[in-house]
Design a protein with these regions (language model features):
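Active-site mouth loops of central-metabolism enzymes
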Residues: 3-29, 94-102
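Catalytic beta/alpha-barrel core
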Residues: 43-49, 70-78, 93-104
């Protein structure tokens, strides 16, 4: 079984507050607690507005990778954002999910 720690998500109020304040120490503590709990991957979701998502994801990825022993699972409702930030990963990662609505999956898969 592969366990994905999904606590680094800006939709969670306390995490959203830490992200908004760029509280690196708070995020690092969350990374360490999830790894200690047995997570195989660390899910990273900005949970911000589309205008802030790229910069927020880049910051989160940098912070998480600075201390994490585990790879990252990128989480965004925007498939183009996933493609944009995925190259920042220093270890092979995962994409959390891609909606099959409309043309969303076409940027990843050729049918």
């Amino acid at each position: 079984m592969i366990l994905i720690g999904e606590k680094i998500n800006g939709a969670i109020p306390s995490v959203g507050n830490a992200i908004a304040n760029r509280d690196e120490a708070w995020i690092i503590d969350l990374v360490q607690r999830q790894e200690a709990a047995g997570a195989d991957y660390l899910d990273v979701c900005a949970g911000t507005t589309p205008e802030l998502e790229y910069d927020t994801l880049c910051w989160l990825i940098d912070v998480v990778q600075s201390v994490a022993n585990k790879p990252i699972c990128i989480d965004s409702p925007d498939p183009h954002m996933l493609l944009r930030v995925f190259p920042k990963l220093t270890k092979p990662g995962l994409v959390n999910s891609i909606s099959m609505e409309g043309e969303n999956a076409m940027c990843f898969f050729r049918f």
